[in-house]
Amino acid sequence: MAKFVIRPATAADCSDILRLIKELAKYEYMEEQVILTEKDLLEDGFGEHPFYHCLVAEVPKEHWTPEGHSIVGFAMYYFTYDPWIGKLLYLEDFFVMSDYRGFGIGSEILKNLSQVAMRCRCSSMHFLVAEWNEPSINFYKRRGASDLSSEEGWRLFKIDKEYLLKMATEE
């Protein structure tokens, strides 16, 4: 592919971001779990206090998808803090459409994220990868990523909204 642009997402990109989130969820066999709306993305990412940041990969018109989409990849991230090592960039979602893989788009997105992390003086970038997703695991390992689950024995937990509400309202 001759050229593509990696740029910060704008509010106008929310429909494309949601489309790609759903494509990623389908790839991960979790499509039914996406309950987020375009309105949520708009309010949560482009309001006064954004909860996330996003980069998009855009291709020129001659490379648009058959459906007419110019946005073919994205990375959603936010900043967090580790009391042992300081600032972290947390990569929440990262996806390039299958027909656009192998052209350096994913590598360029990761390069841009690394530049953001360095500008913000982050200690590292953290993210999750499904155990079965060998292509992604290899993509990250080729770039120096280490698997904290196997190396340090960390386990990921979550508390769903119903239990948060229960704890928040206990007397």
UniProtKB/Swiss-Prot annotation:
Pfam families: Acetyltransf_1. Optimum pH is 8.0. Pathway: Amine and polyamine degradation; putrescine degradation; N-acetylputrescine from putrescine: step 1/1. One of its GO terms (cellular component) is cytosol. The keyword Ion transport does not apply. The keyword Transport does not apply. Its EC number is 2.3.1.57. It is found in: Cytoplasm, Cytosol. Substrate binds at residues 27-28, 92, 126-128, 152. Keywords: Acyltransferase, Cytoplasm, Transferase. The active site is at 140 (proton donor). It catalyses: an alkane-alpha,omega-diamine + acetyl-CoA = an N-acetylalkane-alpha,omega-diamine + CoA + H(+); spermidine + acetyl-CoA = N(1)-acetylspermidine + CoA + H(+); spermine + acetyl-CoA = N(1)-acetylspermine + CoA + H(+). GO terms for biological process: angiogenesis; polyamine biosynthetic process; putrescine catabolic process; regulation of cell population proliferation; spermidine acetylation. One of its GO terms (molecular function) is identical protein binding. Belongs to the acetyltransferase family. Homodimer. It is linked to Overexpression of SAT1 and the consequent putrescine accumulation might play a role in the pathogenesis of keratosis follicularis spinulosa decalvans. This is Diamine acetyltransferase 1. It comes from Homo sapiens. The lineage of its organism: Eukaryota, Metazoa, Chordata, Craniata, Vertebrata. The gene is SAT1.
